[in-house]
């Protein structure tokens, strides 16, 4: 079998309905669009218009705002850190921080810092220097004999 032998299953692809091709076709002249009016013309879709009814975006109240000072963190689980150590991508003896995790390929695009979560197990004794960590993650790191350095404000 070759690529040029491949065919669609019969009946799986319907032929396009060609409209406006003469009155004998059944869909000639107005092409199933009715007579005159906005919807019979081209480029009709009026986004958000609900036929005169008060549209949903005006029925619902405006809410909230976007905090321009909000910080976005890269979330990394302890299991992923351990997997990177096992694969030889991360050095357990060196300090684990944003740069080392990025170099190891654990995170792709660096944001405002790294936040460590407790998913998975940590066997290695590792020193972390990160922007944040969950309480459970801190407990697991200390239980494994490691240490964690957090900014004072981020300590939870």
UniProtKB/Swiss-Prot annotation:
Cellular component annotations (GO), alphabetically ordered: cytosolic large ribosomal subunit
Positions of region (Disordered): 1-40
SUPFAM superfamilies listed in its UniProt record: Ribosomal proteins L15p and L18e
One record GO biological process: translation
Keyword Transmembrane helix assigned: no
Ranges of compositional bias, category Basic and acidic residues: 1-11
Bias-annotated ranges (Gly residues): 21-35
Gene Ontology molecular functions: rRNA binding; structural constituent of ribosome
Presence of the UniProt keyword RNA-binding in the record: yes
PANTHER family: 50S RIBOSOMAL PROTEIN L15, LARGE RIBOSOMAL SUBUNIT PROTEIN UL15M
Physiological role: Binds to the 23S rRNA.
Listed name of the protein: Large ribosomal subunit protein uL15
